[in-house]
């Protein structure tokens, strides 16, 4: 989403977004921490996974267009029966697989080109441009500068772009790390989708 907003010229890395109670029609998202931070930069909003700024950006980009961009890159969104992409999409309103998520995040290390994961080395490589090379560079720099989610200020020799997530109801905790050579995704959850209270992407999957 942030890369698409960068490509559209809607924001740059230090543009200010408002993290405060807002209504988007009849939708009023809150943050995971149940608090708000006021004006925040795009970089901070992305690093901290702030919900309200993300919904604001999705409203400007358009949820249907955003979903189409993801599907074109191999992320086959699973929506509730009869539902069309809406603003809840960016907060877990649609599902995907870990493999598809990793393929999309690989674009950050591949100049904006997503690659469908292959299970066999001789399988054909399927690539799709998801974002511009410039947007991929900026988003990767933002996620690298945030550090590892559970220890954001620890020094490390490896530059890793980290992103984590926790689904509504604690059904899924996930993390993706991107380097020049590897893109690794981790999912923690139960096959039947029952909750794991206290399981967060940053402290469980990362």
Features from the language model and the residues they span:
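Glycine- and acidic
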Residues: 51-52, 85-89, 193-197
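A penicillin-recognizing enzyme superfamily signal
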Residues: 44, 97-206
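Structural recognition of the beta-strand scaffold that forms the well-ordered cores
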Residues: 16, 44, 56-58, 68-69, ...
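Conserved catalytic neighborhood of penicillin-recognizing serine enzymes
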Residues: 7-66, 110, 114, 124-145
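Mid-domain, small-residue-enriched loop/turn segments at the edges of structured enzyme/sensor domains
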Residues: 28-33, 62-103
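Active/ligand-binding-proximal structured segments within catalytic/core domains
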Residues: 1-3
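Surface-exposed patches in mature extracellular/periplasmic domains of secreted proteins
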Residues: 14, 78-89, 115-119, 150-155
């Amino acid at each position: 989403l942030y890369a698409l907003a960068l490509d559209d010229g809607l924001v740059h890395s230090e543009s200010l977004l408002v993290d405060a109670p807002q209504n988007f029609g009849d939708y009023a998202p809150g943050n995971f921490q149940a608090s708000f931070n006021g004006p925040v930069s795009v970089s901070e909003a992305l690093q901290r996974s702030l919900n309200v700024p993300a919904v604001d950006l999705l409203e400007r980009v358009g949820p249907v267009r955003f979903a189409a961009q993801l599907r074109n890159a191999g992320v086959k969104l699973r929506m509730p029966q009869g539902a069309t992409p809406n603003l809840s999409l960016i907060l877990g309103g649609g599902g995907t697989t870990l493999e598809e998520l990793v393929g999309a995040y690989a674009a950050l290390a591949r100049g904006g080109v997503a690659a469908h994961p292959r299970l066999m080395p001789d399988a054909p490589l399927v690539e799709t441009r998801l974002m511009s090379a410039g947007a991929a560079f900026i988003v990767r720099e933002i996620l690298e500068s945030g550090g590892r989610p559970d220890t954001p200020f620890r020094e490390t020799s490896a530059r890793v772009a980290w992103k984590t997530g926790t689904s509504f109801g604690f059904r899924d905790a996930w993390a993706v790390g991107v380097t020049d050579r590897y893109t690794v995704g981790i999912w923690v959850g139960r096959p039947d989708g029952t909750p794991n209270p206290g399981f967060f992407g940053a402290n469980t999957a990362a």
